[in-house]
């Protein structure tokens, strides 16, 4: 009797519905919900959780402020170079500035975690928007056409994170929408093979994505796809051992020929709060003081660059963090 009671209790505990909100099954039943899930994929580049600058984080066990996607990407890309240095002594920062980081560096771990948070949630979205899945759910032809566009955007965002993985880490674990769900050890893909996969993925979606003039602000367009390809081709010799400079020129020319972009007449305008009007930005990660609050992103880049002898109000801020500086070599 005891054994039977335990068995029944356990069975019920394994068959629970979320106490709050919808289950993923319920979410993906309704075609109108997909744009909200897509928004979450984009938000992964700008937000660190569900409650503004902190609270209900996407990644547990790590500070939401310093682990925000753009903040850690900038730290890894710029602090080891002549572009910038940070005067803070927070754990991990001096090592980045002195080119003495290791796999244990908190910013290296944060970047890796952000990348491999973005990729799996994109995989789920891509799987749920497969033609087979949409047909099984009974979505109309019009709904399926719209969701195919969303799927292309999700594939772009996944390719972007894989590009960061390839650029920063080299040989990395590889998972896609066909990978099993649950805990398993994914196979590692070689850097050159990942380059080829990203290239193939981007070329497969470039004509599905909207043109730059038609794409809503902050959403991936054909030009964003071309820009990422050009960026990859520029350093192809590093990633694969074979240069692709002509391909870089070809895809850069596609952006120019599109006619939607040009260098801003005022360079400073590219970095201002109203830079959504700038003709220079091809793919923005959107930040807003009300709706996308974070201690990373542009909040970090601006506040951390304001020193003690600078007037923060000149830069539209209430205070400065007195951290980031450029180096004499760069000047």
Q: Where do the PLM segments sit?
A:
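Bacterial N-terminal signal peptides
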Residues: 1-7
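Conserved beta-strand positions that form and line the central face of beta-propeller blades
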Residues: 9, 27, 173, 185
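An aromatic- and glycine-enriched ligand-binding surface/loop that stacks and positions planar moieties
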Residues: 11-91, 195, 203-204, 219-331
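Short, well-structured active-site flanking segments
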Residues: 15-17, 166-177, 245-246
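Short linear capping/connector segments at secondary-structure termini
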Residues: 20-23, 137-143, 176-183
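Conserved, well-structured interaction surfaces
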Residues: 35, 43-49, 80-169, 185, ...
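Short coil/turn and helix-start
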Residues: 134-138, 174, 239-243
């Amino acid at each position: 009797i005891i054994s039977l009671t335990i068995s029944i209790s356990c069975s019920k505990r394994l068959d629970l519905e979320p106490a709050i909100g919808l289950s993923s099954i319920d979410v993906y039943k309704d075609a109108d919900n997909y744009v909200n899930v897509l928004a979450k994929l984009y938000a992964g580049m700008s937000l660190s959780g569900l409650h503004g600058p902190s609270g209900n984080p996407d990644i547990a066990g790590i500070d939401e402020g310093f682990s925000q996607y753009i903040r850690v990407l900038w730290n890894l890309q710029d602090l080891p170079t002549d572009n910038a240095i940070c005067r803070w002594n927070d754990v991990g920062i001096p090592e980045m500035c002195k080119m003495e980081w290791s796999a244990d560096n908190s910013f290296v771990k944060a970047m890796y975690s952000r990348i491999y948070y973005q990729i799996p949630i994109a995989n789920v979205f891509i799987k749920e928007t497969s033609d087979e899945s949409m047909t099984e759910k009974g979505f109309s032809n019009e709904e399926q056409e719209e969701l195919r566009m969303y799927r292309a955007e999700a594939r772009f965002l996944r390719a972007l994170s894989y590009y960061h993985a390839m650029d920063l880490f080299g040989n990395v674990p590889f998972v896609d929408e066909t990978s099993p769900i649950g805990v398993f050890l994914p196979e590692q893909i070689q850097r050159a093979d990942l380059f080829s996969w990203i290239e193939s993925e981007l070329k497969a979606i470039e004509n599905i994505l909207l043109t730059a003039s038609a794409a809503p602000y902050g959403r991936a367009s054909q030009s964003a796809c071309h820009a990422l390809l050009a960026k990859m081709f520029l350093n192809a010799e590093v990633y694969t051992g074979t240069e692709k400079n002509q391909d870089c020129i070809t895809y850069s020319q596609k952006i120019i020929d599109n006619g939607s972009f040009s260098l801003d007449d005022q360079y400073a305008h590219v970095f201002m709060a109203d830079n959504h009007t700038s003709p220079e930005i091809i793919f923005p990660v959107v930040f807003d003081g009300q709706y996308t609050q974070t201690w990373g992103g542009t909040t970090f880049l601006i506040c951390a660059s304001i020193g003690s002898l600078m007037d923060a109000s000149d830069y539209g801020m209430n205070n400065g963090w007195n951290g980031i500086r450029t180096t004499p070599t760069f000047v």
